[in-house]
Amino acid sequence: MISKIITSIFGSSNDRTLKRLKKRVVHINKLEAEFEKLSDQELQAKTAEFKQRLAEGATLDSLLHEAFATVREASRRVMGMRHFDVQLIGGMVLTNRNIAEMRTGEGKTLTATLPCYLNALMGKGVHVVTVNDYLARRDAETNRPLFEFLGMTVAVNIAGLASEVKREAYNADITYSTNSELGFDYLRDNLAHTKEERFQRELYYALVDEVDSILIDEARTPLIISGPAEDTTQIYQAIDTIIPHLISQDKEDSDEYTGEGDFTLDLKNKQAHLTERGMVKVEGILTEMGLMQEGETLYHPARIALLHHVYAALRAHKLFEVDVDYIVKDGEVVIIDEHTGRTMAGRRWSDGLHQAIEAKEHVNIQGENQTVASITYQNYFRLYEKLAGMTGTADTEAFEFQQIYGLDTVVIPTNKPVIRDDRTDLMFKSEQEKFAAIIKGIEECMSRQQPVLVGTASVEKSELLSNALTKAGIKHNVLNAKFHAQEAEIVAEAGAPSAVTIATNMAGRGTDIVLGGNWKAELAKLDNPTEAEIEAIKSAWKTRYDTVMQAGGLHIIGTERHESRRIDNQLRGRSGRQGDPGSSRFYLSLDDTLMRIYLNEGKLNMMRKAFSEEGEAMESKLLTKVIASAQAKVEAHNFEGRKNLLQYDDVANEQRKAIYEQRNYLLETNDISAMIETIRDDVFNHVISRYIPPQSIEEMWDIAGLEEVLHHQFGMELPIQQWLEKEKDLHEETLRERIINLAKQEYQSKEEKVGAEVMRNFEKGVMLQNLDELWKEHLSAMDYLRKGIHLRGYAQKDPKQEYKKESFEMFTNMLELLKSNVISILSRIQVRSQQEIEEAQRQQHEQAEAESANYQATTEEALAKEKRDALPAELTNLQIGRNDPCPCGSGKKYKHCHGSKARYV
């Protein structure tokens, strides 16, 4: 109450921001007449002028007025579109670390040209981020003429591009891409073996379209690059047969309650838990199958993996539904994005869940994968120096944007007032009654030729409603994950008179629904249309447009409330764009997911009793409050989940940044010999200290153990015991120094034989490969630690603090192991003299000639062979692992390069 009074007196923060920006709009508008007088060449020359001024010390903010005036005038000439004042305000908001909330139809795509041009002047690259490939291509092609007129290069970066094309895309001034492709390219860059293989430049400025979808809805989705793990297909198939024998119970066992079921479900978190009774039953079945020994339990360390498979199968059967969470297409399980309703081809659930669902659906089970590299969107986008976003609905999540990303949200006023009629929700007792009322509502709209967009929460619900409409004889289009390819065509027709379109949870978002239908889409179907054909299409559209306007514009029907008010607002926002008329209404039932999960049985029973007859609709302010309360609970729950994930991921993120920084240093540096020397001293000191403790007496020394480890781990044959017998006063420090110096001398003699260049390449290759391998194993270990860390809470310990402590210990151990492995490999390699190499090459040449009649080498293989033969010296396979990097610097494993079969001489 007090905050409302203060706001009424002083205005809100948003009001003050807008007031300040409107003053700057006045300055930009004053420049308009001056810029209109410029010739095309003079206008285009502004870009070079701005870049020169930046080089001389000017700031982007000092150029803003002129830069925006330049873009506005160029847009008017090239695209026939002039930026509104509110779009200039939006552009200023997006220039820095802010989020602009702009209603649907207010021209976000055109607004984006302003901050993109301004930030591209820095020459560091601008990334415009969209939710799918279609929007990335569409927006790039829409704005390309404008940017190219102003001398800026534009490119699109999507999945499947050739490496060179992708590299060129990132070198463009403005790159349009999807959030997932940007994240995956970042991970790929940090798996590259040479700096030339990398794609991305410095992460400078990102402008995220539909920012709420990417930074909020998908925040908990980690981007993962995986490699194959061991095959467990038969185990998934076997365990899949167990689940039908298990019985559900309503709540978990406790001191006061013991159920008769085998498992309980946590619908909020999509988790399943076996009861004690269920555990015994599953153990019995697994023993009968021969997967466990008699008397073993699933909590035995050797059987934990089986328990993991059981839980994955239980979740697959009881918590994940076909046509809701995934579809089966061409013999594959394809995930449905819960936030957009679109399919996510190529994405797979982790932790064995995807394989469990494949077993459930009796399709081919693809192998499990081991994480090689991963990052969340939260941490990826926080890597940018400047981050901004735009969406139609951000204000409800303003607190989270500020807390997690440090981004302020500014609500941009509409160019024209919104006159959409948002009607009160209607509540029905059952889903069947609700669907009947929806059909009646659609028929009423069609009677006056009003187009209707019906929003559903899942593919399953959209198909149920579609079947009901078909039975009622109502012609309609369905836009869901199964009809993704026809999305643009369906959306183009959604605003036509009497059109009925069913859309899953905002599928089609990002494309405006034009009242009367999209005449440009009709025009695009014609090859070289004549003026007469163009006029005929426009005239027909105008007639349809007038009809729809008189009918009340686009009517939105929501078939149930979503977990977030923001998603509901997005659905409503499809109607009433740019001052057009429109209306919306949500139809609810007590069977809806939101009601079942977040309202207790007592409230539901009370509400059921309020209905006196079948088909009766309830609408009241109390109902609205109950729904708002349920949504607030969900939003709070989801925010805590995302915040919790970030707190854990921040621990891994610090380690990730350290590893990737080290990796980039290795790629950029040609000579790491100084680093290797430092590591060698550390490793040998550590090893020697294990067997000869510092400041200890000789009786405590384990000389035999030291000789053995130096031989096996470092290939050094040292008569340390003999030294001690001959030199009675040989001090510990002197002995330590002698061993380290001998190790250096051995290494230097190898380098003299093989040459400094080859040795530098080998050092770098060994370091990179070992770093990648150990980091991959570390990620798996961190995953396991994360999954079980919550159990520390039962021991009255803070799981987050325990996770930080243990993960740091694991990270430190990994780095120590890295140093040890690298020095071990470098110490054990053996080299041969030039004479031995020439003899080996002569034998090899003779062998190659003998085989030439049966083998035709490709040009590439011949060139590679020629390059290998030209090396000044050869490393043998005597003391080097076949999986170690080849010293020639090719980036290949030894067994695939100089260690290949032809090279074993």
Curated annotation (Swiss-Prot):
<dbReference type="InterPro" id="IPR044722">
    <property type="entry name" value="SecA_SF2_C"/>
</dbReference>
<dbReference type="InterPro" id="IPR011115">
    <property type="entry name" value="SecA_DEAD"/>
</dbReference>
<dbReference type="Pfam" id="PF07517">
    <property type="entry name" value="SecA_DEAD"/>
</dbReference>
<dbReference type="Pfam" id="PF01043">
    <property type="entry name" value="SecA_PP_bind"/>
</dbReference>
<feature type="binding site">
    <location>
        <position position="87"/>
    </location>
    <ligand>
        <name>ATP</name>
    </ligand>
</feature>
<dbReference type="GO" id="GO:0017038">
    <property type="term" value="P:protein import"/>
</dbReference>
<dbReference type="GO" id="GO:0005524">
    <property type="term" value="F:ATP binding"/>
</dbReference>
<dbReference type="InterPro" id="IPR011116">
    <property type="entry name" value="SecA_Wing/Scaffold"/>
</dbReference>
<dbReference type="InterPro" id="IPR004027">
    <property type="entry name" value="SEC_C_motif"/>
</dbReference>
<dbReference type="GO" id="GO:0065002">
    <property type="term" value="P:intracellular protein transmembrane transport"/>
</dbReference>
<feature type="binding site">
    <location>
        <position position="888"/>
    </location>
    <ligand>
        <name>Zn(2+)</name>
    </ligand>
</feature>
<dbReference type="InterPro" id="IPR036670">
    <property type="entry name" value="SecA_X-link_sf"/>
</dbReference>
<dbReference type="GO" id="GO:0005886">
    <property type="term" value="C:plasma membrane"/>
</dbReference>
<keyword id="KW-0479">Metal-binding</keyword>
<feature type="binding site">
    <location>
        <position position="512"/>
    </location>
    <ligand>
        <name>ATP</name>
    </ligand>
</feature>
<feature type="binding site">
    <location>
        <position position="886"/>
    </location>
    <ligand>
        <name>Zn(2+)</name>
    </ligand>
</feature>
<dbReference type="GO" id="GO:0005829">
    <property type="term" value="C:cytosol"/>
</dbReference>
<comment type="function">
    <text>Part of the Sec protein translocase complex. Interacts with the SecYEG preprotein conducting channel. Has a central role in coupling the hydrolysis of ATP to the transfer of proteins into and across the cell membrane, serving both as a receptor for the preprotein-SecB complex and as an ATP-driven molecular motor driving the stepwise translocation of polypeptide chains across the membrane.</text>
</comment>
<feature type="binding site">
    <location>
        <begin position="105"/>
        <end position="109"/>
    </location>
    <ligand>
        <name>ATP</name>
    </ligand>
</feature>
<keyword id="KW-0997">Cell inner membrane</keyword>
<feature type="region of interest" description="Disordered">
    <location>
        <begin position="565"/>
        <end position="584"/>
    </location>
</feature>
<keyword id="KW-0813">Transport</keyword>
<dbReference type="GO" id="GO:0046872">
    <property type="term" value="F:metal ion binding"/>
</dbReference>
<dbReference type="InterPro" id="IPR011130">
    <property type="entry name" value="SecA_preprotein_X-link_dom"/>
</dbReference>
<dbReference type="InterPro" id="IPR020937">
    <property type="entry name" value="SecA_CS"/>
</dbReference>
<dbReference type="Pfam" id="PF21090">
    <property type="entry name" value="P-loop_SecA"/>
</dbReference>
<keyword id="KW-0472">Membrane</keyword>
<feature type="binding site">
    <location>
        <position position="897"/>
    </location>
    <ligand>
        <name>Zn(2+)</name>
    </ligand>
</feature>
<keyword id="KW-0547">Nucleotide-binding</keyword>
<dbReference type="GO" id="GO:0043952">
    <property type="term" value="P:protein transport by the Sec complex"/>
</dbReference>
<feature type="binding site">
    <location>
        <position position="898"/>
    </location>
    <ligand>
        <name>Zn(2+)</name>
    </ligand>
</feature>
<keyword id="KW-0653">Protein transport</keyword>
<dbReference type="GO" id="GO:0031522">
    <property type="term" value="C:cell envelope Sec protein transport complex"/>
</dbReference>
<dbReference type="InterPro" id="IPR036266">
    <property type="entry name" value="SecA_Wing/Scaffold_sf"/>
</dbReference>
<dbReference type="InterPro" id="IPR014018">
    <property type="entry name" value="SecA_motor_DEAD"/>
</dbReference>
<comment type="subunit">
    <text>Monomer and homodimer. Part of the essential Sec protein translocation apparatus which comprises SecA, SecYEG and auxiliary proteins SecDF-YajC and YidC.</text>
</comment>
<dbReference type="Pfam" id="PF07516">
    <property type="entry name" value="SecA_SW"/>
</dbReference>
<protein>
    <recommendedName>
        <fullName>Protein translocase subunit SecA</fullName>
        <ecNumber>7.4.2.8</ecNumber>
    </recommendedName>
</protein>
<keyword id="KW-0862">Zinc</keyword>
<keyword id="KW-1278">Translocase</keyword>
<dbReference type="GO" id="GO:0006605">
    <property type="term" value="P:protein targeting"/>
</dbReference>
<dbReference type="Pfam" id="PF02810">
    <property type="entry name" value="SEC-C"/>
</dbReference>
